[in-house]
Amino acid sequence: MGSLVLTTALTPLSAQAGHTFTLGAWYNFAEEDDNLPTDAYTKNGEFGNEAVIFYVDGNAEPGHGIWSYSAELRIGPGSFTDVDNNATGDEISLHKAWIGLDLNDSHKVIIGKSQVPFGWKTSNFWPGDMYQAGYGDQMDVGIKLQGRQNRFGYNLAYYPRDDWWSTSTDTTDDNRHWGSSDSYRKLNTIVADLNMEIAPKHTLGIALQTGELEDLTALRSAGLKIDNQKERDGEQSAGVLYYKGKFGNNFVNAEAIQTYRSLPSDLAQQDALEQDRETRRYALEIGRNSGNWTYYLDATWAQSQTDGNREGTISAYAPGIRYDYGPGWIYAEYLTQNGYIDRYGDIVDSDYEFNALYLSIDWYYSQSK
């Protein structure tokens, strides 16, 4: 979706040890259009999607501890949260909350809700992950080991669940691609990421993930419900090959993603779905920084490899511009796409067309000690 965002840091973040509190807010104007007979799913020149954001960050002084922490709480309709399937049932989302422990200068353990180390996430603000769709800007709950040695970097992570509560599936920011509170959610996800700096400011990497899918449907057997046991007869796996590079003030990111999901059997039966679902996806981002201005284009494509899915290749493009006005950023972004990727991870309705203009502004104030 699109939004007007406002960001500012009146007090610079401390480069030394300490604690930082940041108050943020954003607001958005959206002009949307699609080829459906009604406008129930579009916004016709509407202002809104406002949110208030609270950040806390900190770390121990060198030689006086190995800890660090980071948390972000969002409140409001622009929180990028899925109200029907999150942990609060409201427009309130804990986007991230983790504690870090430095093992040494090159290795760190992160515990809590943090970024899933899988490829890269887009630079745009409101169009979002587009057809990365569940494999871009994802925040899951678990433990992650990250490290770097010379030109090599790695991440190893285990996420018992994707959100805080037993039936919430809110991965914020890119929602509605990993089930729902009455269909399924992902469990016990293992992620491995290895990347190498092939030249200064140029990184090539590969990441793999695999995990279980828990059945949350009403068809789950009575015995399992009584014993409060989980029915985990679904599974998922994915791999990504990615590149991130900078050429002076220009930047380029590219990746290819292969996804597979075997849905829980009761869910597939209930919704008359093909149980095994596969897609191949591609993403490209190019941009340039020029003073206070940043120009960028995000492009994604997806193809279904699911038996019986006759939808063609779908595509999405989001050109944008961002201006750093001091306390925050002002964004102007356009999104055009055909088709979409649903909660089950497959391509739907390649004849669907959607176009949108988003104007956004954000603002931040930080206080450090």
Regions of interest found by a model, annotated:
Residues 1-18, 366-369:
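Cleavable N-terminal export/targeting peptides
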Residues 15-23, 63-69, 105-107, 150-154, ...:
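Outer-envelope beta-barrel architecture signal
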Residues 18-30, 41-164, 186, 195-200:
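Outer membrane beta-barrel
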Residues 25-33, 51-53, 58-62, 73-79, ...:
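Transmembrane beta-strands of outer-membrane beta-barrel pores
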Residues 53-57, 98-100, 144-146, 193-195, ...:
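Outer-membrane beta-barrel architecture
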Residues 151, 185-187, 195-311, 315:
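Detector for outer-membrane/organellar transmembrane beta-barrel domains
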Residues 351-369:
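Outer-membrane beta-barrel "beta-signal"
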